[in-house]
């Protein structure tokens, strides 16, 4: 039987998964969340599938054996593509992954031309290619790997000239091809929404995945009788190289306090 008081684990390569944690907190106000960010090894998007899978395994074992989490949210597209299926083979709890919102983007696009910004690892993965096969439905889906954007978020450079220049490099070719919908295929990218909006203008719809992931998490917890129905939920953060990243963490999650930010011990 699920212990409803147990925390929910949230795993990401860095701080971008806080965009998913934000959606989880809004939908599940009573839950305690334990957020693990492997900032010291980020980015994961250019690492091998084997490396990402082994690292996710290591963090997942820590969350289950030390903290007894009742569910695990992979708040990272690269981690989902590389490791979700493997983690589900041994974890005795729900494992909720994240995927680029190709299906809803195709459904709402008026021009039948959709852009996807993601990491190279996500775009090259069989899981993403399967997503396109199932849901592109004849639309022109322009997939662009965007190295450097994740690092902009990790450094707290959300709207600097350098960040805007990088965004233009990736997005302007999509705009010339006629996209009217842009899918953010990395959980870091929602923190660049204002900068992205400056480049794409007011008429392009920007889709981020946090709300959909939170809805799935709520359903899976309900299915396992794991929903916590009362109390004020708390967050605890395990960050690799926490001192280096604590300032940006506090910008992205102002409620974080020094005593709730711990060093990921491996």
Question: Model-found features: residue ranges?
Answer:
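Non-catalytic structural scaffold of enzyme domains
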Residues: 1-266
């Amino acid at each position: 039987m699920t212990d409803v008081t147990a925390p929910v684990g949230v795993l990401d390569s860095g701080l971008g998964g806080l965009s998913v944690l934000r959606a989880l907190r809004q939908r599940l106000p009573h839950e305690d969340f334990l957020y693990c960010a492997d900032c010291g090894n980020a980015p994961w998007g250019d690492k091998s599938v084997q490396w990402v899978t082994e690292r996710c395994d290591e963090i997942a074992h820590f969350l289950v054996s030390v903290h007894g989490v009742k569910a695990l949210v992979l708040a990272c597209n690269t981690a989902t593509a590389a490791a979700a299926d493997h983690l589900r083979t041994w974890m005795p709890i729900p494992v909720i992954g994240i995927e680029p919102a190709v299906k809803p983007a195709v459904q709402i696009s008026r021009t039948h031309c959709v852009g996807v910004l993601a990491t190279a690892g996500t775009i090259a993965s069989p899981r993403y290619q399967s997503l396109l096969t199932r849901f592109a439905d004849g639309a022109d889906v322009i997939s662009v790997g965007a190295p450097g954007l994740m690092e902009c978020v990790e450094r707290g450079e959300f709207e600097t000239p350098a960040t805007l220049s990088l965004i233009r490099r990736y997005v302007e070719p999509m705009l010339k091809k006629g996209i009217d919908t842009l899918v953010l295929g990395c959980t870091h990218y929602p923190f660049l929404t204002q900068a992205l909006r400056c480049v794409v203008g007011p008429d392009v719809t920007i889709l981020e995945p946090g709300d959909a992931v939170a809805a799935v998490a709520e359903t899976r917890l309900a299915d396992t009788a794991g929903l916590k129905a009362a109390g004020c939920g708390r967050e605890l953060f395990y960050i690799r190289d926490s001192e280096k990243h604590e300032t940006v963490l506090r910008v992205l999650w102002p409620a974080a306090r020094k005593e709730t930010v711990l060093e990921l011990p491996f």
